[in-house]
Every structure is written in structure tokens, then in C-alpha cells.
């Protein structure tokens, strides 16, 4: 039923308490009729012989066109739509509004747990602010804040969202067809998902990373990452990483393993740092990882967040990508996959 669906959505998106019940501050000039876009579209309707029509201004698609007396309308769509709202009382139009973000306070709240997915979104934030000329703020619920501040200092960060803004977006990535997500993310490259969610049909230019620390050594080095969010993404060829590390060292490179953990257990597998790699594992700030990758000769990793950071700082990425399709993440000419295993 409706209550179950709303609670399911709130839990899935890790949304703040009160998002469904919070006061709608947007006045319409008609008593009791209030509108904002802090959870898709939110509209309070007073008692009376009202008819509400909600549509997509750009396509003309009608989402809702019914008579209603009292209550609150919520849309589940968590992506950019140029909403058009028309309200009639006794068949006379009393209110009409088309979503317009220009000059308005707008929040984007990231509840995505994996920082690689967040990194894929980042270039679209600046572009979204530029296109709509809105007062954009971003809320992150993971450890990317310091790195984002370095890359996009013009975008303020906030600790929590409130509901007195004009609009709030909750980007999500799902491997399924739910109405509040525009697409199953397996159907397009990750570096296009942010554009689809925020209504941008091109890939923006990445921010230019400026290192905040010098190289950890004057010798040439390569960074590697043998772990991912799940061990099924990892390279499971027996002794494969040891072969790679030995080869790189014979070429004169130092090899730094920069995973969070020296050992990761899951999915029936144990993934360990290669013995020949120098141990730079640990829960280090992402800005520190970004600096290390910026100064590295190149990076060898998986379909994981560290690959996204490497790409963000223009460190060449050699991606062992058998878990995902060749087009799924970002473009790199250095992809290694054996589709027979």
C-alpha cells in the first residue's frame, strides 16, 4: 500500500526523517495551497472542489490529472523534471507554475555509499549550477567532502538538508527498474548516469585537480588496488597480482598498494595485498589518495572508487574490468578483460 511504498523509498534512499511530513513553505497566493520540489514534487491541497494537473513542461506528458479535496501529493521521481503544475477550483484555473531553479536555493543530497558512484556524478554538479543559475548546495554522507572541496570550491557543502528550499534532489543508482530511478544503471556508462538524473545530455569537462602535497618519493612509482566494494569484482587469477608487481619492479617502478585494508574477506574469497607491493593501505583521506595518484606514473585497479579518483586526477588507469562491460565506467585505452572466464 501507499504507506509501505513511502517507507520503502525512505529506507532505500536513506532519506532524512520528516521528508514526507515536513512543512511545505512554497506559497502560491492561495490559502492552504503550497508547493515545493523537496521530494520530487510536493503539493498541499486544501479542502474544496479542486482539480490538479501535473505534467512535464518539456514533453507534455501528464502524470496526474484528477479532482482532489484536501491532502498532499508526492511524486516518487528522483530526477530532474521541469514540472508544470496547474490547479483549478470549480473549473477555474487559480494557480499555474513551471519549475524554474534560477536564483533558488537547491540541495543535492548524496546518500550513495560508494564513493566511486559519487565521483561519477561530480562533473554534473557544476554544470547543473551553471545551467540553472541556482544557489546549489550539496550534502555528502561519506568521506568525499574534502576532495570535492578541492575540485569544486564554488559548490558549498552542508551537513544536513532542510525543507525550506525550493528543490532537493536525491541521486540514486539502482540495478532495477523502479519509478523513482530513471534507468537501470547497467544500461549505460556510469559517467552518463549523473547527466540522466540531472537532465544534462552531454558529459561535462572534469575539474582540474591541483595537488596539495608533493610526491611521497622522487622515484617513479605505480599505485595498485586489488580490492573493490565486493570481492566478485576482484581479479581472482591465482598469483596474478604477484606476477604484475614483480614485472613492474623489474622495470624500475616502486609499487604501492593503496587499498583501505591489507586483507579483505567476502564472497568466499580472501583478497590480500601482494607481498611484493609496498604497504600504503589504511583508511586515509581521499585527498591523500588523490595526491598519491596524481604523482603516480599510472594506476592499476578494478571497477572501483580508486579508479574513479585516478581518472579524476588524470592518472592513467589500467582497469582489470572483467566484472563490468568495457564501456561501463569511463573511457580508458588500458582495459584488461578475459571474457572466457
Where are these regions (language model features)?
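Catalytic machinery of carbohydrate-active enzymes
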Residues: 1-341
Amino acid at each position: 500500500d501507499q504507506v509501505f511504498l513511502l517507507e520503502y523509498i525512505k529506507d532505500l534512499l536513506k532519506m532524512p526523517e520528516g521528508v514526507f511530513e515536513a512543512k511545505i513553505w512554497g506559497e502560491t497566493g492561495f490559502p492552504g495551497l503550497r508547493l515545493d520540489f523537496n521530494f520530487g514534487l510536493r503539493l498541499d491541497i486544501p479542502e474544496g472542489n479542486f482539480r490538479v494537473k501535473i505534467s512535464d513542461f518539456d514533453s507534455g506528458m501528464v502524470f496526474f490529472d484528477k479532482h482532489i479535496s484536501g491532502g498532499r501529493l508526492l511524486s516518487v521521481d528522483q530526477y530532474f523534471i521541469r514540472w508544470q503544475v496547474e490547479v483549478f477550483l470549480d473549473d477555474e484555473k487559480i494557480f499555474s507554475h513551471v519549475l524554474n531553479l534560477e536564483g533558488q536555493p537547491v540541495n543535492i543530497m548524496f546518500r550513495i555509499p560508494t564513493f566511486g558512484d559519487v565521483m561519477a556524478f561530480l562533473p554534473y554538479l557544476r554544470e547543473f549550477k551553471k545551467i540553472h543559475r541556482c544557489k546549489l548546495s550539496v550534502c555528502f554522507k561519506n568521506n568525499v567532502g574534502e576532495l570535492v572541496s578541492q575540485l569544486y570550491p564554488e559548490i558549498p557543502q552542508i551537513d544536513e538538508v532542510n525543507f525550506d528550499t525550493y528543490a532537493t534532489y536525491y541521486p540514486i543508482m539502482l540495478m532495477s527498474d523502479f519509478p523513482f530511478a530513471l534507468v537501470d544503471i547497467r544500461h549505460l556508462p556510469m559517467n552518463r548516469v549523473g547527466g540522466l538524473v540531472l537532465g544534462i545530455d552531454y558529459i561535462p569537462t572534469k575539474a582540474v585537480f591541483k595537488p596539495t602535497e608533493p610526491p611521497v618519493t622522487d622515484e617513479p612509482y605505480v599505485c595498485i588496488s586489488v580490492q573493490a566494494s565486493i570481492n566478485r569484482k576482484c581479479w581472482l587469477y591465482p598469483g596474478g597480482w604477484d606476477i604484475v608487481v614483480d614485472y613492474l619492479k623489474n622495470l624500475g617502478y616502486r609499487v604501492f598498494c593503496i587499498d583501505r585494508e591489507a586483507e579483505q574477506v567476502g564472497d568466499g574469497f580472501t583478497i590480500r595485498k601482494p607481498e611484493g607491493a609496498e604497504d600504503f593501505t589504511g583508511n586515509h583521506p581521499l585527498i591523500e589518495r588523490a595526491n598519491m595518484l596524481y604523482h603516480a606514473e599510472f594506476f592499476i585497479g578494478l571497477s572501483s572508487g580508486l579508479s574513479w579518483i585516478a581518472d579524476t586526477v588524470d592518472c592513467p588507469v589500467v582497469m582489470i574490468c572483467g566484472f563490468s562491460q568495457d564501456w561501463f565506467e569511463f573511457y580508458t585505452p588500458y582495459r584488461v578483460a578475459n571474457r572466457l572466464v
